[in-house]
């Protein structure tokens, strides 16, 4: 935080970022894009950095939003040295906004070029390789576990959908939900 403040940057990012698409929408819209093909379609997306690979004058990020993941393709000649240096300082877990043209790399990966940063995370996420293995940490910092582990996030989403469907079904039959500890003056178990 102090390093960002010393550079004259807001450590809490921008107030708003207008995105044009969710990642799943881009996957569907550009599914037929051939390997190595570029488009003139400008898009704006936002999400969390889940992986980063620096290869000389190119940086690849894996960006995740609530709907999916996509690769970001950053070239020093397209961004300039200052912005490229900022991109190198990004950590796992940072929220960024990406604006650029849709393309598919020669290896067939759907990608977007990056030119803006929403916010730098003050505490980076665990590395993807080592992950979050300590059970106690996973339970104490459930928010980190939900960000890092797709399986845990899917379990919570499924649970939420099941409970919601059950509530709707019961409400349609005239039932209402009562949380029983509320009815007692002393909580117990």
Task: Set out the residue ranges of the language-model regions.
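Class II aminoacyl-tRNA synthetase catalytic cores and aaRS-like
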Residues: 1-189
